[in-house]
Amino acid sequence: MSQEAGHSFFDAMKDKGIIAGTVVLSKHGHDAGRIYVVVAEHESFLSLSDGDKRTLDTPKRKRRKHVCPLGQMEKATEWLTSLKELPVPQQSSELRKAIRNFMDGHRGPVTS
């Protein structure tokens, strides 16, 4: 988990809230328990992708209050930008790898 200038993930959450690159757990709905990456943020909604049922092309739109933040991916902004430049099948594959890697405790996208 990245910590800039003595700030923890929780300090960043207090300052900015859930932002793009945050890994979240769905708390409510038919997808409860599913892990997503926030790919875009709106006032009260988030756009979520998991690389499986929800790709970058068709993100899930979910209310902020219906997700629980798990952590922030390192260099998330740069990673999401480079991810969007890949072909769709590769985007999904890289997104799934990054979520799996994050959940295994590495906190960032897998580099080849």
Language model features with spans:
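Short, charged beta-turn/beta-strand-edge "cap" motif at the junction between a beta-strand
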Residues: 29-32
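Ferredoxin-like alpha/beta domains used as RNA- or RNAP-binding modules
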Residues: 2-20, 27, 37-112
